[in-house]
Amino acid sequence: MASPITPPRGMRDFLPAEKARREHALGVIRRSFSAHGFDEIETPVAEDVARLHAGLGGDNEKLAFSVLKRGLSGDDLRAAIESGDTLSLCDLGLRFDLTVPLARFFASHRAELSPVFRSLQIAPVWRAERPQKGRYRQFVQCDIDIVGEASQLAEAELITATAATLDALGLKDCTIRVNDRRILNALLQHCGFAEARWPRALISIDKLDKIGAEGVVAELSEGAADAAAALGGVLAGFEPHLADGGVELTAQAILRILPAGVDTAAIGELETLAHALGALPTGVRLRFDPKLVRGMGYYTGVIFEIAHPGSGSSVGGGGRYDGMIGRFLGTEVPACGFSIGFERVVDLIELPESAGPDSVVLVYDPAMPIGRLLAIKSDLAAAGRRVRLDRRAKNLKAVLDRAAAAGFRSFAFVDADTPAVALDLKPLTEL
């Protein structure tokens, strides 16, 4: 039987035209974030499995791809299965985000980095998702992080840089939804949840759009029925205020929708942040969304997420995670990050289809000496043109149509008598 020739489920091949479109978008993102002072780094695709399963990744830890240790025996496998500790069979795992690797990177290289480090990472990550439209097992994230800055300057810089990047990509009608983990914790305390139950409650609230308030209550009722019922009432009370993506980022608007008695310190900080940001690019707006959670367990303060009407899910998000890096260093290090979900963004924006105005196809005579053909091609490439060779065939129209479909703008026929200069370039658009 023939071997499968399709990619693994949830993973994709990209043909040249699509790859070029993606690289164009990535170039826009790189240039924009670089202009805001972020330095690009690279980390391995795999990390120690214990680090990836340290309880900070939320539900994503359950989706991590793990790598078996070398040299395992059948007895090792049976013992692990019988004990239920199959993770002990693994020593590495593929990264499921870029934040956990960044924390390890900063802890490892702290002495070589500036006290406030602005990081840019653009790289694939892997999660064992159930593949569906817009959700893949391998996908690219574009992360910016500021490590070492405790003030709201970090959040303000991240939101400003991300808003400018969305604008540079031409993505309009974006809403940056904002919340704070401290407000969420205060809500859970107000409803009567013991602190030990907060992480589980946050995971359930994060699924609110999928399972509804009744589903959240059902998940949390065991051992905390009264608290779960109170939370269900609070969540239901939010709905009339969220039709526009949330409420204005002002203390007055936020307090109007929260239950009385919720700690207000974080609310004042959100209003201060909104004032600091000032006017964002046209097509990007800020809103407070009290049910925004962000599923990762490492967030400690302000959290944010990008919503767009053309996407059924968020197209980016992030927040403050002051406690993570301290796990590696034994001392607290403030950190905050923002990630653009590239796969969802690239489907929403208009990108150029062509190879560029300086792209040319040389349709060559098969009898032409190779050295002569390469000399002509090299001269054009040295002059800054993108050059492709295509053999002249009986069906010349098919050759030229293929070149036009690939985005090439012009062509020339070449043979042994063609001069190296003054090629007769013809526009493909006139065919």
UniProtKB/Swiss-Prot annotation:
GO biological process: histidyl-tRNA aminoacylation
GO MF annotation list: ATP binding; histidine-tRNA ligase activity
GO cellular component: cytoplasm
Highest taxon above the source species: Bacteria
Disulfide bonds listed in the record: none
Catalytic activity, EC: 6.1.1.21
Enzyme class (EC, first level): ligase
Compartments reported by the entry: Cytoplasm
Keywords, comma-separated and alphabetical: Aminoacyl-tRNA synthetase, ATP-binding, Cytoplasm, Ligase, Nucleotide-binding, Protein biosynthesis
The reaction(s) this protein catalyses: tRNA(His) + L-histidine + ATP = L-histidyl-tRNA(His) + AMP + diphosphate + H(+)
PANTHER family membership: HISTIDINE--TRNA LIGASE, HISTIDYL-TRNA SYNTHETASE
Subunit structure: Homodimer.
Family membership noted in the UniProt record: Belongs to the class-II aminoacyl-tRNA synthetase family.
Protein name: Histidine--tRNA ligase
